């Protein structure tokens, strides 16, 4: 093993890359776990934009937003991705309409695994994988899904999945957490009267260097994620 290859996510406006050890190792399977509105999606959006700005290609599968809503959301954070969508560097796949009608679908995850175009990019993001698993009517074996993700990351690709723990049984969560090379938990907390987001790095198997275990951030219009110095015990 030579020096670990890192995918760069640096942006001049924040120092998130330094907080996580300088970049994201190729071959990472990152799980961002947290309840509703704790900052999982915005963290994915920041990472996606960071990868794109550093010339990596990204597939973004969303159970949350239509394409237009995603473009608006990214623009509101000043993470403009219009050109990246047009050039094909960013492939955005909204599966929201499929989930919105509340009917469980057969073979939902099978389709996710069989759509080759998703995995042609350098980075593949599923926001959220828990919604995809919870909305699949067929007997999906999450072990199989994680084994499949491992085969993809073995090709030096990076997969990032968000998980709302309320959507899945503990047995499934355990499989997902165990499979992750990096596990981040997002939380909300109050600090000096302000609501802040906290990203706790609980596991980082391939950490390239020293990293900050507790990253405090807030979401600001036109700035995106603003990482704070504030430390949390």
UniProtKB/Swiss-Prot annotation:
Organism superkingdom: Archaea
Record has Metal-binding as a keyword: yes
Protein residues bound to Mg(2+): 41
Binding residue positions for ATP: 38, 40-42, 64, 196
GO molecular function: ATP binding; ATP hydrolysis activity; metal ion binding
InterPro entries, sorted: AAA+_ATPase (IPR003593), ArlH (IPR056568), KaiC-like_dom (IPR014774), P-loop_NTPase (IPR027417)
GO cellular component: archaeal-type flagellum
Pfam families to which the protein is assigned, alphabetical: ATPase (PF06745)
Keywords: Archaeal flagellum, ATP-binding, Magnesium, Metal-binding, Nucleotide-binding
Localization, UniProt: Archaeal flagellum
Annotated transmembrane regions: none
Function: Component of the archaellum.
NCBIfam families, per the entry: PRK08533.1 (NF006320)
UniProt xrefs under PANTHER family: FLAGELLA-RELATED PROTEIN H-RELATED, UPF0273 PROTEIN TM_0370
Family: Belongs to the FlaH family.
Name listed for the protein in its UniProt record: Archaeal flagellar ATP-binding protein FlaH
Source organism: Methanocaldococcus jannaschii (strain ATCC 43067 / DSM 2661 / JAL-1 / JCM 10045 / NBRC 100440) (Methanococcus jannaschii)
């Amino acid at each position: 093993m030579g020096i670990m290859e890192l995918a760069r996510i640096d942006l001049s406006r924040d120092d998130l890359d330094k907080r996580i050890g300088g970049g994201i190792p190729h071959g990472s399977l990152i799980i961002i776990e947290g309840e509703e509105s704790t900052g999982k999606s915005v963290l994915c959006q920041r990472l996606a934009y960071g990868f794109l700005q550093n010339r990596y290609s990204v597939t973004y599968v969303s159970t949350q937003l239509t394409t237009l809503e995603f473009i608006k959301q990214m623009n509101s954070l000043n993470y403009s991705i219009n050109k990246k969508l047009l050039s094909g560097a960013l492939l955005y796949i909204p599966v929201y309409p499929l989930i919105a009608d509340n009917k469980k679908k057969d073979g939902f995850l099978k389709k996710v695994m069989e759509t080759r175009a998703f995995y042609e990019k350098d980075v593949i993001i599923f926001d959220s994988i828990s919604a995809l698993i919870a909305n699949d009517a067929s007997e999906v074996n999450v072990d199989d899904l994680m084994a499949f993700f491992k085969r993809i990351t073995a090709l030096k690709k990076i997969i990032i999945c968000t998980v709302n723990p309320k959507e899945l049984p503990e047995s499934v969560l355990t499989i997902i957490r165990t499979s992750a090379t990096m596990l981040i938990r997002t939380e909300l907390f109050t600090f000096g009267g302000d609501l802040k987001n906290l990203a706790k790095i609980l596991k980082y198997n391939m950490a390239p260097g020293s990293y900050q275990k507790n990253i405090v951030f807030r979401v600001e219009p036109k700035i995106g994620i603003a990482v704070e110095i504030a430390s949390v015990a």
